[in-house]
């Protein structure tokens, strides 16, 4: 499977075309819109979330709530477009009209794609860069992830994302009774944190950063349960599942690091304290005594829960902007201020969930069949049976 996204932050709409989704999958616009609503929540979001009430429209590839096997086109309209029709329109404009535009940007913001993108594509107006590099694009990535999650749910595979840390505040209570319990608690938390007390401190940290004109980052975790053994490959570097998952997480705006299981903590431990002992269970078959490696060994799933974490840097758009240089005058200047969040970590956990779900679904569909969801389900069950009887 693959998908492409198109659209600018203040353009008329965002679009994604998804190819390779198996036929027969039950999906509705409500399924997708549920995920889009989750992305828009979270303490620390900016005023843009009050303007946009994202609703996806299925334009092709689905008939009577069943996928056809043909490309699926999804569209999300931007409500704010009506205020940007002249500035962001596709029609040509005169030189006088271009000069009159007050929203041309020649002052790159530190930490953004503005300057590098402007140099790469020779844009004197850096709005041409920031409109596409905006995290607004993750809207349709979450929409694609919603389709992936529907595929996984058909196969008994569950995905949940939550927040482990915001700023210096870390969740202490992280042991959940079930993935459903984790989902239930985090959906009720304004910061998507399982630890209620830590969640309150996280909100206070966000409020403090906002009051200071600053921003704040954090760490999110995604759990995947119900995976059959052997998804991925040890044969080639580019087929290793952890490699693909790492790339997916790091492709999310502002993410700067990724780890699996105990992750970087493994550097300070002996091997006996890192690797997971193999045990035999009459009901489950081969399993592990621990899950320090996060459900992945040799680029393949072990059958244990996949545990992947990503670190998100603080959003670089600040209300007390850092110094920059005007590309026209070459004079130092305080960077321009665009409407932004003070903290997007809670929303980022939803985006990370979607990104991980997509890579997992893609790997499963590729390995167990491409065309029909019923055939894929049958093949997955056969693999589960094989691993129990091996």
From Swiss-Prot:
Cofactors (names): FMNH2
Tagged with keyword Transcription regulation: no
Sequence positions that bind FMN: 132-134, 253-254, 298, 313-317, 339
Annotated metabolic or biological route of this protein: Metabolic intermediate biosynthesis; chorismate biosynthesis; chorismate from D-erythrose 4-phosphate and phosphoenolpyruvate: step 7/7
Protein EC: 4.2.3.5
Enzyme class: lyase
Binding locations of NADP(+): 39, 45
Keywords of this entry: Amino-acid biosynthesis, Aromatic amino acid biosynthesis, FAD, Flavoprotein, FMN, Lyase, NADP
Family: Belongs to the chorismate synthase family.
Role according to the record: This reaction introduces a second double bond into the aromatic ring system.
GO-annotated biological processes: amino acid biosynthetic process; aromatic amino acid family biosynthetic process; chorismate biosynthetic process
Cellular component GO terms held in the UniProt record: cytosol
Cofactor comment text: Reduced FMN (FMNH(2)).
NCBIfam families, per database record: aroC, PRK05382.1
Molecular functions (GO terms): chorismate synthase activity; FMN binding
Gene3D superfamilies: Chorismate synthase AroC
Catalytic activity: 5-O-(1-carboxyvinyl)-3-phosphoshikimate = chorismate + phosphate
Subunit record text: Homotetramer.
Species assigned in the record: Bacillus subtilis (strain 168)
Protein name as it appears in the record: Chorismate synthase
